């Protein structure tokens, strides 16, 4: 799932989901009725018939996640899943990510350290082009957290 949603904006929400389900019907396990998926993502009935081009950024992100819920991938790769979302949608997305991590590998990039602490079993920090495993127990230490933030600041201004 991309931080900037990529969707067929000439379709409505219903058309997009139906099209996806039709072309992937052989691989979708235990499909639900369309409305069930929209309800799971808190997409209101009046929004389901709107063209995707008229959806807000947050609604487009919800549609991308809806497609992933239907596809049920074993590995879910997300780029900044909460970027540009309002507080309500961000909280919904965080709860969804928490529920989706059961039974699959979820990998996501984020600049929100508290989000990583809340949702991740393991945290890896990308600094100066190198990956470094961060022990979550160290993140309870305020000084260690400050060290990470300082390193990230240094890198972003370099």
Predicted regions and their residues:
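A short, surface-exposed alpha-helical micro-motif characterized by mixed small hydrophobic
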Residues: 116-118
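Catalytic Walker B motif of ABC-type/P-loop ATPase nucleotide-binding domains
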Residues: 76-80
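Conserved ABC ATPase signature
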Residues: 51-58
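Helix N-cap at the start of a conserved alpha-helix in ABC-type nucleotide-binding domains
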Residues: 87-89
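Q-loop/switch helix immediately C-terminal to the Walker
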Residues: 9-25
């Amino acid at each position: 799932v991309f931080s900037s949603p990529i969707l067929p904006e000439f379709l409505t929400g219903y058309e997009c989901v139906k099209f996806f389900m039709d072309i992937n019907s052989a691989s979708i396990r235990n499909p639900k009725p369309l409305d069930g998926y929209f309800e799971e993502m808190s997409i209101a009935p009046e929004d389901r018939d709107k063209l995707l081009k008229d959806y807000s950024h947050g609604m487009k992100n919800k549609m991308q996640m809806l497609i992933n819920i239907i596809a049920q991938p074993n590995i879910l790769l997300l780029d900044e899943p909460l970027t540009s979302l309002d507080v309500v949608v961000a909280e919904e997305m965080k709860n969804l990510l928490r529920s989706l991590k059961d039974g699959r590998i979820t990998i996501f990039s984020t600049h929100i350290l508290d989000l990583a602490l809340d949702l991740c079993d393991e945290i890896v920090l990308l600094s100066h082009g190198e990956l470094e495993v961060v022990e979550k127990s160290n993140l309870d230490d305020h000084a260690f957290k400050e060290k990470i933030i300082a390193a990230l600041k240094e890198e972003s201004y370099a």
